[in-house]
Amino acid sequence: MAKIDIDQIGALIQKQIEDYKADVRLESIGKVLSVADGIATVYGLSQAILGELVELPHDVKGLVFNLEQFHVGIILFGRTDLIKEGDNVRATKKIFEVPVGEDLLGRVVDPLGNPLDLKGTINADAYYPIERPAKDLMHRGFINEPLHTGIKVIDALVPIGKGQRELIIGDRQTGKSTIAIDTIINQRGKNVICVYVAIGQKDSTIANLVKLLQIKDALDYTVIINAGASKEATLLYIAPYTGSSIAEYFMEQGKDVLIIYDDLSKHAVAYRELSLLMKRPSGREAYPGDIFYLHSRLLERAGKLSKEHGGGSITALPIVETQAGDISAYIPTNIISITDGQLYLEQKLFYQGVRPAINAGLSVSRVGGSAQWKAMKQVAGTLRISLANFRELESFAQFGSDLDPSSKRRLDRGRKTVEILKQDVHELIDMPSQIVTFYALENGFMDDLNLKQIRSLMAEIEQGLSLNETGKKLRKELVEHKAIKDKALMELFIDHVRRFI
């Protein structure tokens, strides 16, 4: 029998002890107490922080939404039907993040950043938290560059600047989304990235939008985040924050971004649903007390950075749906007070055939005027007052009273102004064409024309600025100086195109 070498065994054990590396991980694990309606109540995550990402079985993710004394409330993303009582929940000590980067351009994704368009995986340049603080006051710059929509009534009366937050508000089926989509299409060739956040929209609507943007060559610079009407309230809730994080990535690269939130009424309803399920105290219209903060922290992330910090910008166009034209309701008044102005679409105007149905009296742009071209201010500066006077005179004239010649001229000019401001869907007008049209109106070149001839003249102006030598020269001057320097050239061109109607 071989003799056992005690020393050798002792040395071997000693070496094993020295080579042993303890791989101890300290994890925070909780247990699901109850789960229903995309909400889980979890016991045991005593160190959880608000907004933290947690992991559950079956690759389901969660976001810490409520902190109670003995448990936490978590909103779930993924196959929530597979989660059951007693399942483990692991805290990650990470804030909820989404992929951002150039690879998202031209893609349709869900609010988690997963592709929905069957075009393959997305290679992220970085991962941003969905909740990020708004840029510091000292990092911001002045809003002094215009963001042209191609819609005459907006560019002339309610101009939008890069970095502005302009609310689009009105009843359903009045053209709110159409204005937003036309603005995206008008950014073609202008080096502006567009982010469209669809909240509670039908999937067929988004499919049609993708086709339209492809036809208009606008998809390549657009990111679409779709939280469809059939999705859980949890996805609808995080969708605008995901869009804002994607937009911030491009802004920090020094680029100009346009973001559309369509619409924040449905976002508020989704948040109300989650809050009520979490048994939070409800207030006015059953919304929770922090509903204002929900939207203020989102919209404050838009703005323009100073040149020292890259000079990028995020222009936000949130959309809100009203009921029976009531803009004094809770959510509309909240968002009106947060934004830098609003475009109010009126159902009455829409049914009268005035489209886009923007009520110039109730619409305002608080900061866009500082970004507007000087040429547009020269020709459309008095247009808002003239239009208001026309509306007043028109209502007076309905009584059949005899009008003096001056009032008849004002009435005729007003009707022509309304006709000029009408615009078909996706029929976008560039700035030089708009300026020449308003110059012709203000200086009497349309006084002897009927409405049909005015439509013909507008078409000739747009065509002449691209084909006619005088028109090309005028266009170049307007684009370079952004002001009317040579009135003789302007009037020569208008006289020339008038011959063709």
Curated annotation (Swiss-Prot):
Q: Which class of enzymes does this protein belong to?
A: translocase
Top-level taxon of the source organism: Bacteria
Q: Where is this site: Required for activity?
A: S363
Q: Which InterPro entries match?
A: ATP_synth_asu-like_sf, ATP_synth_asu_C, ATP_synth_asu_C_sf, ATP_synth_F1_a_nt-bd_dom, ATP_synth_F1_asu, ATPase_a/bsu_AS, ATPase_F1/V1/A1_a/bsu_N, ATPase_F1/V1/A1_a/bsu_N_sf
Q: Which family does it belong to?
A: Belongs to the ATPase alpha/beta chains family.
Q: What is its EC number?
A: 7.1.2.2
This protein is called what?
ATP synthase subunit alpha
The protein's annotated catalytic reaction(s) are: ATP + H2O + 4 H(+)(in) = ADP + phosphate + 5 H(+)(out)
For this UniProt record, the keywords arranged alphabetically read as follows: ATP synthesis, ATP-binding, Cell membrane, CF(1), Hydrogen ion transport, Ion transport, Membrane, Nucleotide-binding, Translocase, Transport
Sites binding ATP sit at G170, D171, R172, Q173, T174, G175, K176, S177
Describe its partners and assembly state.
F-type ATPases have 2 components, CF(1) - the catalytic core - and CF(0) - the membrane proton channel. CF(1) has five subunits: alpha(3), beta(3), gamma(1), delta(1), epsilon(1). CF(0) has three main subunits: a(1), b(2) and c(9-12). The alpha and beta chains form an alternating ring which encloses part of the gamma chain. CF(1) is attached to CF(0) by a central stalk formed by the gamma and epsilon chains, while a peripheral stalk is formed by the delta and b chains.
HAMAP family from the UniProt entry: ATP_synth_alpha_bact
Give the protein's function.
Produces ATP from ADP in the presence of a proton gradient across the membrane. The alpha chain is a regulatory subunit.
Q: Which organism is it from?
A: Acholeplasma laidlawii (strain PG-8A)
Q: How does the record classify its membrane topology?
A: Peripheral membrane protein
In alphabetical order, the GO MF annotations are: ADP binding; ATP binding; proton-transporting ATP synthase activity, rotational mechanism
Q: Which PANTHER family match?
A: ATP SYNTHASE SUBUNIT ALPHA, MITOCHONDRIAL
Which GO cellular component does the record give, naming just one? plasma membrane
- Note the Gene3D superfamilies from the entry: 2.40.30.20, ATP synthase alpha/beta chain, C-terminal domain, P-loop containing nucleotide triphosphate hydrolases
Q: Tell where it localizes.
A: Cell membrane
